[in-house]
From Swiss-Prot:
This is Probable conjugal transfer protein TrbK. Pfam families: DUF2749. Residues 1-19 form the signal peptide. The gene is trbK. To A.tumefaciens Ti plasmid TrbK. It is found in: Periplasm. It comes from Sinorhizobium fredii (strain NBRC 101917 / NGR234).
């Protein structure tokens, strides 16, 4: 095969892989966020993601001796 054919094939493969990557990324980004049921289950298991309340005086973490 001539050099021009090899270069054309390499460019074609690069273009196809770039297009496939862009389509995969866009399809994942277009999915809506988790439904309400999944979100509540996640918050129940992992916590709500809110900031923890401040530590009261005398309740600091210390060694258990």
């Amino acid at each position: 095969m001539s050099r021009a054919v090899i270069i054309a094939l390499v460019i074609l493969v690069a273009a196809v892989s770039t297009t496939a990557t862009a389509l995969i990324v866009n399809s994942r980004a277009s999915n809506p966020s988790a439904p309400e049921e999944q979100r509540t289950a996640k918050e129940k298991f992992f916590g709500a993601g809110k900031a923890l309340p401040p530590i009261k005086d005398g309740q600091e973490m210390g060694p258990r001796w």
